Amino acid sequence: MSTDFDDITVEDLRAVGGLKWSAYPGTIGAWVAEMDFGAAEPVTAALHAAVDRGLFGYLPTAVAKDMSAAYAGWARERYGWDVPTRNVRAMADVLATLAVTITHFTAPGSPVILPTPAYMPFLTLPPSLGREVIEVPLLVEDGRYVYDLDGVDAAFAAGAGLLILCNPHNPVGRVLERAEMEAIADVVDAHGGRVFSDEIHAPLVYPGHTHVPYASISPTTAAHTITATSASKAWNLPGLKAAQAVLSNDADRRRWKEVATWAEHGAANLGVIANTAAYTEGGPWLARVVDYLDGNRRRLGELLAERIPEIGYTAPEGTYLGWLDCRALDVGDRPSELFRAEAGVVLTDGVLCGGAGAGFARFNFAMPRPVLEQAVDQMAEALARR
């Protein structure tokens, strides 16, 4: 595949056979959160070397420790967060880390607070573990989504034990500021609550915004947080199954040690090796990708303003996901169905992100810019035919 992102074609992407381009044949894939830009050369080189060695058995302790050290170095360099290597644990993915957090770090049966719209599995995983999800819709202030602190406070008062915090936020693209997180922490601490902080999109932040790990803010946040992250979104590795659970206090580390054998089962050798290479050698590739995505998020705004001005859009501060307000189109609560059927463009239905997502759609713009332009053209033409 071409290393010039503009030169990658729809035919190239379909030939790869990835989920985004194979699940709905003949369409433009702008739904599932994976990118169309291949992978960083240091990552693929590390994978080839591991395959050539035949490293297909159980995860070696030394390989897991290398990844922990790599992430700790990345966190220190990029975020100024000094995390002890022993507190970075190898996991299969963010959802596995959430399952461990709910099962072993909250009171049995306690509900989970979820600001919505939200990453879709956050709505479905807690109920599979016997936990109620209390949706607290985000508020919009001055054109930006913010947390409803009164709603979060009320949910904790009603017996919830855990707040799921997603930063950078999927799907709305907010990158929380320190003051916002300090206010959230005050509410959590007042109720003796816990926070699960999903920071998988942290490397994908645009100029003018800075990622601050929630657990790094204060001793208070460190004491009540388990953080989950991975190189999988920023370096396009979701199928390789590796992530990091980051513990930020001694009590959690001791508790984690009691369940680690089960909790950490599933992190794959190749995924761990790929994460290590990404954190240690993937910076230049990531910088090029983020610069390209920055152009895409701006171009998406221009295209929508020109072709479909009825769709509301605010360029995200992080992630490669555009949150499209389609309510003015008067096409119902599930606009993605129209765009898939009549435009041949597959988006993620906002309803899947919770009740607050009705009438919205999530657009993955991590694609070649000519394909992005083609997608919006097809959407506009479909609406014009109605």
What residue spans do the PLM features occupy?
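N-terminal small-domain helix-loop-helix segment of the aminotransferase-like
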Residues: S2-D93, V100, T280-E281, R386
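Conserved core of the PLP fold type I
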Residues: F56-D186, P203-L204, H211-S216, T220, ...
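PLP-dependent enzyme catalytic core of the Aspartate aminotransferase-like
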Residues: G73, R334, L338-L347, C353-R386
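Helix C-cap/helix->beta junction micro-motif
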Residues: L129, A190-H191, T221, A343
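Conserved core segment of the aminotransferase class I/II
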Residues: P219, A223-D294, L383
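Conserved glycine-rich beta-strand-loop-beta hairpin in the small C-terminal domain of fold type I
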Residues: T276, L293-G301, Y313-C326
